[in-house]
Amino acid sequence: TVMGAQVKEAAVMLPLYTFCIEFVLGGFKRKDGEWNRPILTLYGILLGLPMVAGLMWVSARMLHFDVVTRMMTEARVMFDYMHWTLLPNLDSLTLFHDDIVPSKGLLDPSTTLAAIVGIAALLAVALWQRKSRPMLALGILWFFSGHLLTGTVIPLILVFEHRNYFPSAGLLLSIAALIPQFNSAWNARAISVGTGCLFLFYAFTTHLRSMEWSSPINLAASDASKRPNSSASQYEYARILLTTTKNGDPEPMRQKAFAILERMAADPNAEATNNQLLIVYANELKRPVDPKWWDSMIAKFSSRKPTSTEATALVALLKCYDAAFCSRDIGHMRAALEAATSHSGGYAMLYAAFGRFAAKYLDNRELAELQFQRAIARAPSDPEYLLQYAELLIESGRFDEAESIIQQLHTLNRFDLLNSQLARIEEGLVRAKSNQTTH
């Protein structure tokens, strides 16, 4: 498990998969029928302690919808995964599925309740068939176990079909476990023909999908056409168009990209990443920046907590300012940062970005200090925010407080990874003290 986790985080689920095997095939019993206490203790440690730690970690790190909303939505998504695995529809096979509307209640949409009941029924079947059809039970448990890490409370994107690598094996195991039930000669022939047709269908669908993957522009265009309301699909298509030419002329592609981005920027349900890309490329191509792009971005940040991709995009836009690559619209940038950081449980990188912006462009050290303090409170073990805060304190002449922050950084300097940053900031502190004494 430890070795696998160095390559792929999903390897941490290996103890849960073996737990399912033990539950179905052994029942945690010894040969004499008594409980196998060492096995129970082992799984209590391997599964119980990480579960408690994980729940504590995610308690304040949710996306802009709460845990209940996420869990209700994921119930519907589980059946989408089953559909895409067993009977894939080319129109539904895309990289992004962010246009799936989160469930707002058990009957909004109505399929939410049906999905929850369906999952409960499948788990009940697994328990019921554990002894008579163990492979059927194990396949069902493996499918849901495979989604326990990414499809429950951890704040990841709601839908990502590539999460089905191992869970799909559980589905196929369950289907394979049912085939022996049809053991007459006629049924055997029917099953052989049906299986052959199914494999031909899978092969043909895979061939069509591979054609869509033939080039980045083909894949992006295909996904965007299938999901016109997917912010991520439209963003990716526009991004690729902006770096593509048609017969050596980039302008037709650029016009198409800007039309896509402007439509998504005006959509209140689309991510603000589209607005950010519009602003950055308008600067790069020496085009005017429409104030409406800023206004709709600010409105999106005001109405809900930014997603992680939106937070990253806004920080990147500020870096575009720092590099003097983008024209500096200080008023709009301040409004965007204020809106993005107005929600509880925000991202530390946004608070730190606001702090840098306040210090550099507003000359407001009080506001900058407040934002850095918020960043450190959200990520107290991240040395980057402490380093930036210490620099601000040194520039403000508050040397004692800066030294206190530097001491905190020394405690975080594991394996001497921060030596160069600490040396730089300590030299700056000594120089600032010397300059103050001289003057």
Give residue ranges: language-model regions.
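Polytopic membrane enzymes that build or remodel cell-surface glycoconjugates and lipids
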Residues: 1-275, 280-292, 306-311
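C-terminal luminal/periplasmic domains and tails of membrane-associated envelope-modifying transferases
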Residues: 217-439
